Amino acid sequence: MAEIRWRGEGSVDGGVREREFEITGGRDTITGVMWSPEGGIPSGSPLVLVGHGGGGNKTAATVLSTGRGLVLEHGIPAVAIDAPGHGERGGVPGRSPEYYALWADAEIMTDHANADWSLVLTSLLETGWFDAERVGWSGYSMGSLIGIPYVATEPRIKVAALGLCGVAGSTPSRSSVGGLLVNRAPLVRCPVIYIIQWNDERFTRDGCLALFDLLGTRDKRLLSFLGAHGEMPEEGRKSGRQFIAERLKA
């Protein structure tokens, strides 16, 4: 299995250690970052994988909020990686021709991203720091376009925070991702909190609600906020973190 190469000891800010790493993947080098308690990672700790949005990267503001929040609020380490074509792996801007080209074939894009995450998760579990039975996923927008197919096929994920996506709207109309989500969502069996923006301009409200209905788990809750796609309040992300932490610590 691929070995994690840590980029030094990282930095500490406000009780949270941020430490970057890289792993040689099947197509290129996977670049990532881990947030953990300053004092160290207790043996058998839970772990949360964090997916970023389209055009973002592993240290985007919303990802930092999730990663640092999990550590500060719940003592749970979190990890994010640059998705294919993003961050150190390409740096495509969101909603650009280059971004939509990545999603021209949604199955290829998600297969590549999911292979990356499976490799990263296996490598992290091999450190002996984490409990393989207490792994969660948090990802909204593109973090759900990638996350739903991943959670559907990765039995090591025990709980997920998803949302800001649906099966219809301007974003899914540009690729085959809507059909892919229709096929994969029924395979999601772990507990899910699903968060939508009521006035999302990229995914229709009906398309978001339809995707929630399609999720195969019987343990799911829906949370919505007024506002556009990029206006999810911190309350929403905090609710996602709380849901994940409660399930991983149960």
Name each model-derived stretch.
Residues 97-128:
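Alpha/beta-hydrolase active-site loop
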Residues 43-53:
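Short beta-strand element of the alpha/beta-hydrolase
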Residues 1-43:
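N-terminal cap/lid segment of alpha/beta-hydrolase-fold proteins
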Residues 168-224, 230:
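The feature captures the conserved acid-bearing segment of alpha/beta-hydrolase catalytic domains
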Residues 68-92:
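Conserved alpha/beta-hydrolase
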Residues 55-67, 83:
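The serine-hydrolase catalytic nucleophile loop
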Residues 226, 234-250:
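Catalytic active-site module of serine/aspartate enzymes centered on a nucleophile-bearing elbow/loop
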Residues 128-141:
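Alpha/beta-hydrolase fold nucleophile elbow
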